[in-house]
């Protein structure tokens, strides 16, 4: 279940494409002088691709109000990107030479003089400064003042069935600021939110799984149901536990001791401490120590309604993330950083809190949106935070999405964001088979096709059925191919959208299929209106991301506690080794499927049962093949992965 940075962002025109994030923006560098506007520096990417002449519906009223964030470039934006790369590259002399948060701010942050100059410019145009952080200056005002400040005209544009405001040309800033401005967000008012990637309903109402179940893969065969792929198939597992996942991914003796993991989502579950403690006790996980689970929360929440961000729907996301990390890395410290809403500005604030205060070395993020909805100005703001984190030795892990190639969901083949950033680790998903005695059997790329049981119970209707969900992946249309993917990612994938090569997602993977999912425990509203703790099986790349974050905590412990930092160069350096399970869609040589029984009403048998067959390894147009692929990346952690971080005796 992955939290989408915005359910309502699906109203965008799916035909929209974004300019390539190359050169200045890709590195977080302020754009060059505007040739058509002397004395101004263009802020590239501030005019959305959907703001076309054909869609133009006329000028926005001068009196309309705007709320903007002017992001600061800092003293040395190009130097920040270069240092972030060097400190993360195992082949660099600077590898692992991280800076403290204070050192990062002193070396790369905006100076007091830069901030003062930006504030002076903004107020001189009639905008009102409403807040200042080390990353941005927030302002409000009317359209006329914004147009004056950024030397552009704001028009209304048709975007799908909606109308939104946007600049008619790229915004700019005075060149007298000497590049102090990175970008500005808020000139366009299309929704910028995230969705969580859960595959099951949120905790507002109870959800329970019906049986029969397998306790491990294949333990209970559906003998009374029709065959699939020429054989009887097992019932879906009840939900794997931490013990099974630790065995599958080679945890060994490591527990994440001494390692700090952060989780970002929107809002905060009011019952997380109780739920996490109850779950750990019921499933044999280590008891949470006093102070081991922290929460860093905003003073106020916004956009909480069901038609906005649906705050309660995010509670299950936090629950899954916290319980999954603790199940796999039971001694790691966990800090949950909640956003004030599911909008990008608030999620960026959460990420910045982690970096500015170095709350953790490993950050799991189970939320995102489609690439067509991310504008380059936001991408620049995100990348700046990711680069600052890399310099401190902080790595960010993002779920790759739950809709496969997104065609069934949006009508357009595309990847998700921020997982598409070259500065984060995109985590894809698999279907996992753990057998008797916690033995790893196999994995497939996660992609599900569903067919229902016929009325007479003798066949599966229209077998194998329709695509329901699967790991997000594919080739970005906006992000250039990063150096660490060259030589590993097949050329056919890298050049799918551009002969010069683009970023391909994901980088690495873990369990995600809800049909081979993880059991979680959460306080839910029961059918009678009471609230009580109950458990259910869940999946999505929302599960894969915290599992990989937890495995990274084990790896960091194995290397003596030294931060792994931005992990992609290291992940690709281990490609083709015993560190990974090389996942394919057909690991057993024949079709794979499980039988699943669900309550029709989602919680009990009052309204009957629904029986279906779920075929595995059917991820839309994406395929898990031998070697790197766009479903699972380099693969999943094998027994050799954590062990590969152990330094030989005598090695310093």
Question: Locations of the language-model features?
Answer:
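Secretory targeting and sorting signals
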Residues: 1-35
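An often Trp-containing, charged/polar helix-loop segment at the C-terminal end
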Residues: 8, 556-627
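Substrate-binding/charge-relay-adjacent region of secreted/lumenal peptidase catalytic domains
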Residues: 35-131, 138, 143-429, 469, ...
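Helix N-cap / loop-to-helix initiation motif
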Residues: 114, 544, 599-603
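Tryptophan-centered motif/residue detector
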Residues: 314, 367, 442-448, 456, ...
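Polar, glycine-rich mid-to-C-terminal structural blocks
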Residues: 420-477
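Long, domain-scale functional regions
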Residues: 544-545, 577
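Short glycine/serine- and small hydrophobic-enriched flexible loop segments
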Residues: 549-557
């Amino acid at each position: 279940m992955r939290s989408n940075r915005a359910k309502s962002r699906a109203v965008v025109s799916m035909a929209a494409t974004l300019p390539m994030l190359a050169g200045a923006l890709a590195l977080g560098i302020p754009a060059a002088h505007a040739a058509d506007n002397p004395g101004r520096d263009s802020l590239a990417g501030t005019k959305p691709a959907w703001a076309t002449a054909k869609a133009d519906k006329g000028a926005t009223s001068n009196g309309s109000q705007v709320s903007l964030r002017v992001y600061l470039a800092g003293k040395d934006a190009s130097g920040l990107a270069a240092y972030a790369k060097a400190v993360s590259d195992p082949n660099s002399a600077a590898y692992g030479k991280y800076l403290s948060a204070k050192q990062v701010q002193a070396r790369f942050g905006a100076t007091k003089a830069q901030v003062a100059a930006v504030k002076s410019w903004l107020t001189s145009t009639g905008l009102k400064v409403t807040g200042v952080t080390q990353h941005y200056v927030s302002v409000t005002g009317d359209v006329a003042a914004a147009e004056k400040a950024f030397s552009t005209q704001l028009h209304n544009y048709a975007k799908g069935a909606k109308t939104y405001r946007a600049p008619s040309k790229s915004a700019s800033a005075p060149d007298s600021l000497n590049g102090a401005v990175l970008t500005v967000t808020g000139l366009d008012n299309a929704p910028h939110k995230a969705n969580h990637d859960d595959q099951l309903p949120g905790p507002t109402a109870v959800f329970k799984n019906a049986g029969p179940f397998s306790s491990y893969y294949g333990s209970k065969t559906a003998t009374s149901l029709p065959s699939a792929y020429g054989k009887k198939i097992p019932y879906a597992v009840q939900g794997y536990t931490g013990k099974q996942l630790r065995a599958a991914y080679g945890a060994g003796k490591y527990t994440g001791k001494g390692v700090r993991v952060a989780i970002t989502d929107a809002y905060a579950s009011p019952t997380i401490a109780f739920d996490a403690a109850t779950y750990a006790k019921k499933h044999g996980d280590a008891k949470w120590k006093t102070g081991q689970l922290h929460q860093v929360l905003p003073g106020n929440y916004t956009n909480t309604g069901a038609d906005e961000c649906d705050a309660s729907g995010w509670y299950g996301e936090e629950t899954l993330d916290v319980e999954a990390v603790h199940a796999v890395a039971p001694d790691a410290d966990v800090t949950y950083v909640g956003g004030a809403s599911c909008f990008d500005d608030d999620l960026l604030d959460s990420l910045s809190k982690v970096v500015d205060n170095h709350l953790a070395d490993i950050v799991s993020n189970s939320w995102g949106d489609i690439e067509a909805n991310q504008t380059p100005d936001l991408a620049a703001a995100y990348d700046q935070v990711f680069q600052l984190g890399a310099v401190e030795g902080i790595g960010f892990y993002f779920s790759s999405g739950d809709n496969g190639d997104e065609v069934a969901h949006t009508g357009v083949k595309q990847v998700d964001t921020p997982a598409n950033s070259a500065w984060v680790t995109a985590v894809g998903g698999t279907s996992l088979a753990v057998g008797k005695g916690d033995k790893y059997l196999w994995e497939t790329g996660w992609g599900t096709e569903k067919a229902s049981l016929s009325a007479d119970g003798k066949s599966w209707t229209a077998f194998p059925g329709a695509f329901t969900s699967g790991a997000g992946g594919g080739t970005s249309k906006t992000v250039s191919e990063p150096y660490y993917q060259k030589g590993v990612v097949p050329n056919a994938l890298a050049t799918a959208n551009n002969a010069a090569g683009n970023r391909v997602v994901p980088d690495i993977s873990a369990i995600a299929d809800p049909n081979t999912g993880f059991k979680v425990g959460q306080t839910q509203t029961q059918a009678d209106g009471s609230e009580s703790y109950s458990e259910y099986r869940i999946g999505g790349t929302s599960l894969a991301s915290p599992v990989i974050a937890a495995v990274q905590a084990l790896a960091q412990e194995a290397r003596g506690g030294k931060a792994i930092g931005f992990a992609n160069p290291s992940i690709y350096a281990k490609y083709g080794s015993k560190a990974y399970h090389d996942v394919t869609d057909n690991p057993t040589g024949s079709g794979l499927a499980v039988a699943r029984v669900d309550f029709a009403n989602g919680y009990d048998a009052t309204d009957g049962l629904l029986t279906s067959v779920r075929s595995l390894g059917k991820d839309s147009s994406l395929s898990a093949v031998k070697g790197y692929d766009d479903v699972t990346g380099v693969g999943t952690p094998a027994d050799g992965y954590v062990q590969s971080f152990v330094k030989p005796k005598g090695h310093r």
